[in-house]
Amino acid sequence: TQELEILRRTWEQSKQSACFTVMVGRRRIGKTSLLLESVKGTKYLYLFVSRTSEPLLCQQFQKDAAEALGIQIFGTITRFRDLFEQLLIFSTKKHYTLIIDEFQEFANVNSSIFSEIQNLWDQYKGKAKINFIASGSIYSMMMKIFENRKEPLFGRLTSKITLQPFAVSVFKEILNDYNPRYTPEDLLCLYMLTGGVPKYIDLLMEAGATKKSKMLDMVTSPDSPFISEGKDLLVSEFGKEYGTYFSILQLIASGKTIQSELDSVIGKNTGAYLANLEREYSLTTKNRPMFSRPESRKNRWSLNDNYLQFWFRFIFPNQSLIEMGKYDLLREVIDRGYEQYSGLVLEKYFRSKIAEEERITGIGSYWNNKGENEIDVIAINDLDKTAIVAEVKRNPKKIDMNILQSKVHSVKELAKYKVELQGL
């Protein structure tokens, strides 16, 4: 993969001069396995930051350093800065990789660790031959640590990698390996539940859940990891404000996508929360109609993560069924809403597929001031002046190309493109 190439190139570069890389990505995306794959067969030290006291953490790290690198540090180290200094000194003699996983958790251990790392890094980087990688899954904290001008580690990075879920073509291939006779319905269900997150695909495939019905059976079984996963992922991200954030995400997942609708249900202005969800947490996107101006007020909000969208649509609102152990009724709720909900996911699937496969410079949807005259997919190429305009329906027989053609005529900006109509 592209990320693996960047990591290997950085490793090579770090033999000459110290490199500092950050890798960010949601939990379960496969950061750790990718990092370990990139340093296979080389000298490396992997440290995992857990929420514990600094002396206890250092005790564990001291043991890890002795085992992985043979560094003997006499006496008991109780401050991370002392250990980090020893690791940097070691790298002036021997080249190796230092991976610190869940790096943002240092904030809960001792927040001054970041400035201590910065001081020591600035002091030793000229002579160190170290490939230092900080990996983290709480997006907001990682961005604050490395991209906020007021933070000590701002401007210290050699490179930054944001790990994304698998592309459509990749998880299609994976499903085909496990079930060569899969149907489009099976593929859509896999996309709807996992969004291409490797760990979720893995859980389903390893359990033999390669068909739609089996996938939904597994997700709604009493021991399903998918039931509590949404809460596990986000409570630590949001802290004590999580109640309001969860309510907003539940409303967006249920189809209330305009801020005024959200404000009236929540009973207060949700603007600041929505801005945080988009900028700090990267969980939502403010969608504007294609060709509209940046200051357009016709915005609609959507969730970026397919699994979380599914969780907020079906699992979170039905906690009472789960607490009563009525998993059969939870499955019934999903079955009833499946047709309509998966139709919306299908639009997203085709947007991802077109973005991956076609030569385009922009992609989105269209609706007018009244929220009418909707077009599911408009993909444009400003270099060739071509556009793909598509209507997406679960039942392609319901697509009327004449209506789509008349919608195209009503969007004056499309007049300068050679338009190809598609029914998907």
Summary of predicted features, one role per range:
Residues Q2, R297-L424:
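A cross-kingdom feature that marks ATP-driven nucleic-acid transaction machinery
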Residues T1-E332:
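Phosphate-binding site recognition
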